[in-house]
Amino acid sequence: MGGTVEEILQSLGFSANSLQTLYDVLLSPIADLLQCDDLVFVPDGPFCLAPYSALSDSVRIRTIPSLTALKVIAGATDEFYSKSEALLVGDPYLEEVTYGTGEPMFEQLPCAKKEVEMIGELLQTSPLTGRNATKAEVLKRMKSVALIHIAAHGDKYFGELVLAPNPERTSQKSEKEDYMLTMRDVYAVRLQAKLVVLSCCHSGQGEVKSEGVVGIARAFLCAGARSVLVSLWPIDDKATLMFMESFYEHLADRKSASLALHHAMKFLREKKVLCCWRKYSAIKYWAPFVLIGDDVTFEFGRHEHVKGVQLEYPKTV
C-alpha cells in the first residue's frame, strides 16, 4: 500500500498518487465484478474517512455508516419524508461569539452567504443569514423541510456547527449552548429531510468507531434524514461556492444527488476557462465531498404555488 490507510489519507492533499493508491486498495479488487454505475460502501475505522466519491469517474460511490442504517433507510416509506420547502443557512453572525479577551472566535464567511443566496434564487426560498441564522430558528425550521443546507463553520472533533447566538439568553456573553448546534441537538429533532448538505469545515470527520463516522453527519441520519452530503477535510470557500453552484444546477436538472456530486467534482477538477479555476484542479479542492446514505432526486418548481422544492424518488429495482 505504500503506508497505512491513515498515512495515505493524511497525505491526500496534495498527491494524486495517494488517490490512485486508495483506488488500488479499495476499488480495483472488485472493479471487474461491478455491473452497475452506483456503488455503496459500508466503511469501518479509518476507511470512513476515504473520499470514495473521488475514486472513480465511471462508478458513483456513496457510503452508509452501518448495515443497520442501510436497513432503516431502505425500510422508510416515501410518505414519511417532506415533499417541499428548503432550509438554507449561511454565514451566521458570529461577532458576539468571543474569547474572554473579546476577540472573535470565528471569522465571517461571505462566500457562504453568496452560496445560500445563489441556492435560494434557484429554489425560490429566502435563506437564513447573519443575525437571522440563530440556533433556535434553525432547530425550529429544520423539522419539516425536504432539504437542509448549512454553510457555516464546523468542528471535526465534536461534530458541532456554529450558528448565530440566540437573542434570548440569560447572560450578556454568548455561551456555547446559545450558538453551537451539537449532535445532541440534532438527535433530539425528528427530521423529514431527504437531503442535508453540510458545507462546513470538517463537517464529515467525527470520531471514528466501528459503527461508522460518529459526527454531525451521522446525527442527521439518525434524526431521520435520508442522505447527507459532507466534506471530509477543510474546504476553500471560493471553491465550495463554485462546487455548490454546479451541484445544485445538476439537481435542478433532475439528476440524482450522487450524479450531481459526480458532475460538480468533475466541473471543479476540469474547469480552466478562468485563471482562478486552475488551482482548484488539485485533489484537496474537489475530492473531499462524500454522499452518505441514500440517493435522492429533486424536482424544482413543478408547482409554481409551492415555495421551495418538490421531490421525486429514484426508482429502485
Regions found by a protein language model. Name each.
Residues M1-V317:
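Catalytic cores of enzymes
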